[in-house]
Amino acid sequence: MKKKQLYIGVLSVACCALVAIGITLHLLYPKKQIKNLVKTPPVLRLKPLTADTLKKKPVKKMDFNISGTLRDKEGKGVAGVIVSDGFNCVKTDAQGRYKMKRDSLAKFIYYSVPADCEVPTHSKTDRTAFFYQKVSKGKKTYNFTLTRLPGGKEIHYKMIVIGDPQVTNAYSPYYTSPDDNPIKKSDVERFTTQTMADIRQTIQNLPPGTPVYGLSMGDDVQYYGGYNAKLERQIRQALGSSEMRLFSVIGNHDQDGKALYRRKWEENFGPTDFSFNRGDVHYVCINNCFFHRGMAYYSPGELRERQVKWLKQDLALTPKDMKVVLCYHIPFTFGNAPFSKAKPLSNANEQGHYSSSRLSLLLSLLKPFKGGYELFCGHTHFACNHEINYQGEDVMEHCHAAACGNIWQSNINICGTPNGYYVYSFVGTSISNCYYKGTFWDKSKQMTLFRAQTDFNGEKYAKDWQLANNRNILVANVFNATSHWRVVAVEDGKEYLMRRISSKGQDAFAAGYHHKYSESVSYRFVSKGNGYLIMNHLYYYTPRNPNARIIIKASDPYGNTYTASSDEVTTEPFANFAHYYEKEHKK
């Protein structure tokens, strides 16, 4: 009991002392000083997370507004030029000035080369187009200097179109003689000494002063054999090594779904969606390789919403009296690995193929142009001027054969068309001429001939197309043919229309050759097992007299007639133009 009373007494004294101290402090010091005198130990101090106690870091707002001026060499502003960041498009004013809010994801600022100005190039020896500047953080002004063409806008010019150079890091089968002794030569070397050497000769044969431009339809490289950081630069330098000034589309193998690969292409060629003008033609190049899982992409090609938005802006700023040539890699009118909204083709001979979900929209954007439109692509490694009736309209897509053929496994594409390129002549808004130029072939040679019953390493045209095996039927492979060509057989002075084959299938000659010699490309890719290959430039004729000498005449819509004789039929499955070039053999 005494202890308890003692505790109570001590506590009472302590409380009185604390009260006395509190009163004294209150009288002697202001409140702020009291807080400083009596501090809570840090461990016991708790700060409530309120708006008043939290210190906000100032957020620096990025200003994406940019501007610039396009001037000629004399310092005069260039008016009416489309400038873009790959997301938005604006036009320069009367003084050549522009303003725009660039997208935060933009990589380049660039312009659509006007028809009356030169195509700027990377250098005098690398004549690939250089019409862009890389976006720099914090840079607000992007100016460009343009060079006027001495004679103003060109009335006529040539456009050389190259399908799939597709150089790899591997050494592909290469022969210079009718033997089985391969020569070691890289794909870049072959493209340089064969394709580009032939293009330089073609340009040299043109009338002096003829303007010549070039388009690569993509798949400039493929990293087969391993990644090579120098490969895109090597192919760019090869493509730029002639007199033509050249633009390139990006292909699926330039990317293969990898950011690194795409970045390498952009480092060398610039933006993937862009446009330029030559003569009365507006060219639009766009990346339609839509990857959805790793390297897997949609076929037919597709576009993302932001690309559609960009395309609409670009075309809205383009005069409607021009022709538009839409350039891309993967065909829009056929493909057998479709996006869910793609539409199946109605042609029974092309069952399993689809048209792009974007085709209707694209055609609606192109129809208002009074100069018409053209659809240019590559990708397939076979020549195909693909014609479909789409929503009541006849549509043709020019699918260009590959410069590399069957990815440098031979000298031919999987449809039998030789490795090569196309030469277009433009006058105003019209294509006045177009021919296929096989590498090291004379331009007058536009077809190859075969007998239906000839066995090409187990493959026959007779078997593929249900033709008689004992009638000496003549088969003509007319490389650039369309339904507008007239192909006839002349027997005993009389002309007979040849029947055109247009269906999924294979080329017996190409399938047989590649089955033996192709190393890195499977037999399935070149044969009817492909399920993708559309053969629509084969014609056949059953002779009245199986032993008659027959002349084949193929007339195109441009007034050219090409001829070949039954004396020229290919019967040897291996030691032929697919295997080696006479020109190189003679060296």
Predicted regions and their residues:
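Short beta-strand elements
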Residues: 126-135, 559-587
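N-terminal active-site segment of His-dependent metallophosphoesterases
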Residues: 37-65, 103, 116-225, 586-587
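Aromatic sugar-binding surface patches on proteins
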Residues: 505-541
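Binuclear metal-dependent phosphoesterase catalytic core
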Residues: 394-481, 485-492, 533-566
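Extended active-site neighborhood of metal-dependent phosphoesterases/phosphodiesterases
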Residues: 115-123, 129-138, 145, 225-319, ...
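A short, amphipathic beta-strand motif
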Residues: 66-72, 96, 144
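Short amphipathic beta-strand segments in non-cytosolic proteins
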Residues: 62-63, 69, 74, 80-91
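Short, acidic Ser/Thr/Gly-rich low-complexity loop/linker segments typical of extracellular
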Residues: 81, 87-102, 500-502
